Swiss-Prot record:
UniProt entry keywords in alphabetical sequence: Cell adhesion, Glycoprotein
Subcellular location: Cell surface
Listed GO CC annotations: cell surface
Single GO BP term: cell-cell adhesion
Pfam short name (any one): Dicty_CAD
Entry protein name: Glycoprotein 24A
Family (UniProt): Belongs to the csb family.
Keyword field contains Glycoprotein: yes
Post-translational modification as stated in the protein's UniProt record: O-glycosylated.
Function of the protein: Cell-cell adhesion during early development.
The UniProt record lists the keyword Glycoprotein: yes
Domain of life, per lineage: Eukaryota
Length: 102
């Protein structure tokens, strides 16, 4: 697990999740789906009040690099036993810079 931060912008403003995290395997489809698992995380913003959400834009900060997130649909789910949260992002179009760890 490494430091991971995702910032998402939607109609409710900017929301973030940050902490220790890593990408999870995702199907090889185009445009890509990004799936991340966070532990020891913190959330900020209104987006986390809903389990499903629309994203206008965003960015991933991972291993010293930044990757854009284009318009997308997202979901999240919490695993109370492992004290973890999984974030799934279904991109509507390809990003300018692909996240290579997925």
């Amino acid at each position: 697990m490494v430091d991971l931060k995702i910032t998402l912008v939607n109609e409710d403003g900017e929301s973030t999740i940050s902490g220790k995290g890593h990408p999870l395997p995702a199907p090889l489809i185009f445009p890509p789906i990004y799936i991340f698992r966070f532990t020891q995380y913190q959330t900020e913003g209104k987006l986390w009040d809903k389990n499903e959400f629309q994203i206008k834009s965003g960015k991933i900060e991972f291993d010293g690099e930044e990757y854009d997130i284009p318009e997308s649909k997202g979901t999240w789910s919490k695993d109370d036993e492992e004290n973890a949260i999984d974030v799934n992002l279904h991109l509507f179009r390809p990003p300018e810079k692909f996240f290579p760890k997925n």
